[in-house]
Structure formats: structure tokens, C-alpha cells
From Swiss-Prot:
The gene is Dph1. It catalyses: L-histidyl-[translation elongation factor 2] + S-adenosyl-L-methionine = 2-[(3S)-amino-3-carboxypropyl]-L-histidyl-[translation elongation factor 2] + S-methyl-5'-thioadenosine + H(+). Disruption phenotype: Global developmental delay. Abnormal palatogenesis; palatine bone absent, micrognathia, cleft palate and small skull. Results in death during gestation or soon after birth with a small body size. May also result in preaxial polydactyly of the right hindlimb and abnormal hepatic development. Knockout mice leads to an increased frequency of tumor formation. Belongs to the DPH1/DPH2 family. DPH1 subfamily. Residues 1-24, 402-438 are annotated as: Disordered. This is 2-(3-amino-3-carboxypropyl)histidine synthase subunit 1. Binds 1 [4Fe-4S] cluster per subunit. The cluster is coordinated with 3 cysteines and an exchangeable S-adenosyl-L-methionine. Pathway: Protein modification; peptidyl-diphthamide biosynthesis. Its EC number is 2.5.1.108. It is found in: Nucleus; Cytoplasm.
């Protein structure tokens, strides 16, 4: 599933900006022309890519052609970079655009790098592997962003068998995953609901079932276990931190193993509380704004600055694309750091830094804006976050709703189970964004 961000909308052939035709939103939905979709040469070229990875090549080519784009940039996580050269060759062969690969590290949707793309003269950016989390500031004409989720098909039957062998019928299970597996998650939920109380929780603006490393929903007390579909533990740990009393399981779609997973909540919380306690006696503060794509939020930075000014605490601002202990050690006069980039950097690696490295939430606790929360909040991009130390708090955009606790209702995906809700309910999908990006 892909989502398109455009700077203007008009009928095909209309002239908006210097020579770019625009298309209405109604024409954007799955109307790839037959000459593109059924092109035998294109079909043969796409066969080089893995058949279970949906890179949406025909749609991408059509979007580029419709935009009359001349310079296209591709941005993707490192796990997909091995396919980048092949995609470049295909796009350049079937469009008139020059295509380049943006090779800087891309950890998540927060790293979408439209700033660099525009600086390079790019008029069309394709971001692979993540949902459209960050609304684009499309006030600059003739720049578009296409999000390609890269839906990955897996052996759903094995997943279902694994769940049935592990959990007794009638169990209450919550299913979560990353965006690549949301369509499989929805299909599995439909199959399992006959024997289990299945919920696919949603933390808006994310899709039903989708979680991020920094954003996960609180589950209802009735949920007996949460099952995460995906490789690695980074995203799983997010929902575990938000729900410390619910047993967690991970199904690895590549290794085909369903395993019980554990997290040392006591150690994590003790470490973070120690850092907060140390920060309360700090006389000099450092505020780090992440510059890796759109990771940093100027709005949060401004809030922190205001709080420190009100308390008469001196601070220094530091812009960094990536944050390392060796870099911060070059400023020894700073007593405590607050990083507005990725909360998990502090949670996972904060103890590796010589000075306390707080998240904006932890800074709010240290400055007594809020008390320590149980469980630890994972609401950094949530539309129902706790306070102005999160990205979407108080933002003037269409109502997002709440981080929904799990219920016994399976969220229905549209268009055959694709993760369409990520785009249908997102302000940045196929329309002009109404607010600046964080």
C-alpha cells in the first residue's frame, strides 16, 4: 500500500506551478493505466525483485509520470537497500526521471528526509518501508512524497498453526506488528476470531495493529497475551513497556518461530528514575534537536526552552543527526542532556552516556511538570499523548482519536485487507497537509 503527498490538487493537464500537471484525489486511487500495469517488459523487470515484497513498482512509475518528475530520490531502511539499485534501474528505464538513492541511515518513518531531497533538487521522493507518520509541509510547489509500505507476504498458515498450538481456545489475544505485516495481521485476526477473543488495537494516527518503537497502545485488562508479528525486538519492546503486566510473544516470520519474550521493566525504570533524580540537581542543561530527517520536533524543543527559562536554568542547544557518548563528552560543562529525537535512545542506551540523557517526558518529570507515570508511557506520536513533550499534543489537525485499548473487535482493512487505514485516516495522504511537520 502506498500513500501520496502532493502540494496541490487539480485535474490532469492543468498547470499548477512551473509546468506540472496535477491530478485530483479521486483519480489517485488504484487507477494505474493498463499500459503501465500490463506492460510485459515492466512485468519481466519486476520479476528480479522478491515476489513476496510489494514495492508497488507500477504505481510508483505511474505517479512519477503523472508528476512529470525529473529528479527522483529513493529513501529506505538499510534492510531494503540491497534492492535499491534494481529499483533505480527499473524506474529510470520506464520513466524520464533521474533516480538517486539517499544512503543516510533511515531508522523509521520519522526519518523521512524531504529537506535533503529538496536541497538536492529532487521533485519526487519515494520513502519505503514505513507509514506516513510525518505530515509533509507541501507549501513548496512541485514536490511530492510517495510512501510505499512494502507489504511482505509470509506463510500465514504457519503463523495460525503456531498460535493455535500455543494458546487455548477462548484466550483473549491482542495482535500487533509493523506496517509491513499489517495486512497479514488483519488476515490472521479474521481466521483466529472464531476460536479466540481477538483484538487489533490502534494508537492513532497509526493503522490498526501498527506499533512503533516509541508509540504503542495501552491494552485492556482483559487481554491475556499480546502477539507481535515481526523480526527483532525493537518494536515489540515498545508494546511491552506500555503493557508490563501482559505476557508478550513474538512470531518471527523468517525463522517461523513463536517465542515468549521478556523485558526487565524494573531495571529499566530504576535506571531512568536515577537519571531523572540526577537531572533535578543539574545547573546546566543541554537540549539536543535530532536532525536525522524529521526526527526532531522544534515544537517540543520550544516547550523545553520555555520551561527552562521560567525556572531560570541555563541551557545550550545542540543539533545532531545521531547522538553518541563521545560527541556529548566534548561539552563537559553540560550537566544533563535532553534529546528530542528518539525516546528509545535514552531508554535503551541512556546508561552508556556519562551524563543523564533524558527523553522529553523524563525532562517533564525532572522539572515537575508531571509525576512519574506507571506504566512508562509510549505515546511519542500518539494523538492522545500526555503533554507538550510529545509530537502530536495539541496540534491543530483533524481529530485523531485516542490510543484505543484492545477490544474484541477486529479492525477491518479496506481493499482486500491492505493496510489502507494508515492512509485513509492520515492528513498527509493524497492531499495537501494542513499543518507543518514536527
Amino acid at each position: 500500500m502506498a500513500a501520496l503527498v502532493v502540494s496541490e490538487t487539480a485535474e490532469p493537464g492543468s498547470r499548477v506551478g512551473p509546468g506540472r500537471g496535477r491530478i485530483s484525489r479521486g483519480r489517485l486511487a488504484n487507477q494505474i493505466p493498463p499500459e503501465v500495469l500490463n506492460n510485459p517488459q515492466l512485468q519481466a523487470a519486476v520479476q528480479v525483485l522478491p515476489s513476496n515484497y510489494n514495492f508497488e513498482i507500477p504505481k510508483t512509475i505511474w505517479r512519477i509520470q503523472q508528476a512529470q518528475a525529473k529528479k527522483v530520490a529513493l529513501q529506505m531502511p538499510e534492510g531494503l537497500l540491497l534492492f535499491a539499485c534494481t529499483i533505480v534501474d527499473i524506474l529510470e528505464r520506464f520513466t524520464e526521471a533521474e533516480v538517486m538513492v539517499m544512503g543516510d541511515v533511515t531508522y523509521g518513518a520519522c526519518c523521512v528526509d524531504d529537506f535533503t531531497a529538496r536541497a538536492l533538487g529532487v521533485d519526487f521522493l519515494v520513502h519505503y518501508g514505513h507509514s506516513c507518520l510525518v505530515p509533509m509541509d507541501t507549501s513548496v510547489q512541485d514536490f511530492r512524497v510517495l510512501y510505499v509500505f512494502v507489504d511482505i507476504r509470509i506463510d500465514t498458515a504457519h503463523l495460525l498453526d503456531s498460535v493455535r498450538l500455543t494458546f487455548t481456545p477462548g484466550s483473549s489475544l491482542a495482535l500487533v506488528s509493523t506496517i509491513q505485516f499489517v495486512s497479514t495481521l488483519q488476515a490472521a485476526a479474521q481466521e483466529l476470531k472464531a476460536d479466540y477473543h481477538i483484538s487489533v488495537p490502534q494508537c492513532k494516527p497509526l493503522s490498526p495493529g501498527e506499533i512503533l518503537g516509541c508509540t504503542s497502545p495501552r491494552l485492556s485488562k482483559e487481554v491475556e497475551a499480546v502477539v507481535y508479528l515481526g523480526d527483532g525486538r525493537f518494536h515489540l519492546e515498545s508494546v511491552m513497556i506500555a503493557n508490563p503486566n501482559i505476557p508478550a510473544y513474538r512470531y518471527d516470520p523468517y525463522g517461523k518461530v513463536l517465542s515468549r519474550e521478556y523485558y526487565d521493566h524494573q531495571r529499566m525504570q530504576a535506571t531512568r528514575q536515577e537519571a531523572i533524580a540526577a537531572a533535578r540537581s543539574a545547573k546546566s542543561w543541554g537540549l539536543i534537536l535530532g536532525t536525522l530527517g524529521r526526527q526532531g520536533s522544534p515544537k517540543i524543543l520550544e516547550h523545553l526552552e520555555s520551561q527552562l527559562r521560567n525556572l531560570g536554568l541555563p541551557f545550550v542547544r545542540l543539533l545532531l543527526s545521531e547522538i553518541f557518548p563521545s560527541k556529548l563528552s566534548l561539552l563537559p560543562e553540560v550537566d544533563v542532556w535532553v534529546q528530542v529525537a528518539c525516546p528509545r535512545l535514552s531508554i535503551d542506551w541512556g546508561s552508556a552516556f556519562p551524563k543523564p540523557l533524558l527523553t522529553p517526558y523524563e525532562a517533564a518529570v525532572a522539572l515537575k511538570d508531571i509525576s512519574w507515570q506507571q506504566p512508562y508511557p509510549m505515546d511519542f506520536y500518539s494523538g492522545s499523548s500526555l503533554g507538550p513533550w510529545t509530537v502530536n499534543y495539541g496540534r491543530d489537525r483533524a481529530p485523531r482519536g485516542l490510543c484505543q485499548p484492545a477490544s474484541d473487535k477486529v479492525q477491518q482493512g479496506s481493499r482486500g485487507g491492505s493496510p489502507a487505514p494508515a492512509c485513509e485516516s492520515c492528513n498527509c495522504a493524497d492531499q495537501k497537509a494542513t499543518s507543518p511537520a514536527p
